[in-house]
A protein has these predicted regions:
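Classical N-terminal secretory signal peptides
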Residues: 1-2, 151
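Alpha-helical solenoid scaffolds in large eukaryotic transport, assembly, and signaling factors
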Residues: 2, 9-107
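Eukaryote-biased recognition of C-terminal alpha-helical segments
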Residues: 109-151
Length: 151
């Protein structure tokens, strides 16, 4: 289940990396609601921050993408760059499964249905294949990688 509590200082476990420190400075102490405008306007930057976050912050702030990409949400209706946001979400899942599976596996059940929906509704997200590639093909990779991590 996705973490519903704003991460605290000990959850960030810096390990002395600049990437985590930058993510901390941008996200620390902020709610999902507070971060939605940033993720909506800068999905590629948000991807970069979330990709390097430790488990608890990642498991909390991934909700910004989930909320933004839910086609029934107001945030989705207001998002100007749905294609980039959807591509970043799918790519972020792929990155975490490949590089930090321990961060994402506990919440994969909460993410996989949205990932599948996005992959089968690429046009809804205004994501041209020529620009973003094939979401169905990326979803196949995600499913395979998820299965491999669970074995």
């Amino acid at each position: 289940m996705i973490n519903q509590t704003i991460p605290e200082d000990p959850d960030w476990s810096f390990y002395g990396t600049w990437d985590i420190e930058f993510a901390y400075e941008k996200f620390h102490g902020k709610s999902v609601d507070e971060m939605l405008p940033f993720v909506s306007s800068c999905p590629t930057s948000a991807y970069g921050y979330l990709a390097e976050m430790p488990a608890k912050p990642f498991q909390y702030y991934i909700q910004t993408f989930v909320r933004l990409l839910d086609p029934t949400s107001l945030e989705f209706a207001e998002c100007d760059d749905k294609g980039s946001a959807a591509s970043c979400f799918l790519s972020l899942i792929d990155y975490k499964l490949k590089n930090q599976p321990e961060c994402i596996l506990p919440i994969m059940d909460d993410l996989i249905e949205l990932a599948k929906f996005i992959s089968t509704h690429q046009s809804l997200y205004e994501a041209k294949i020529e620009i973003f590639g094939s979401f169905p093909e990326l979803f196949e990779v995600l499913e395979r990688r998820n299965r491999e991590c669970l074995e």
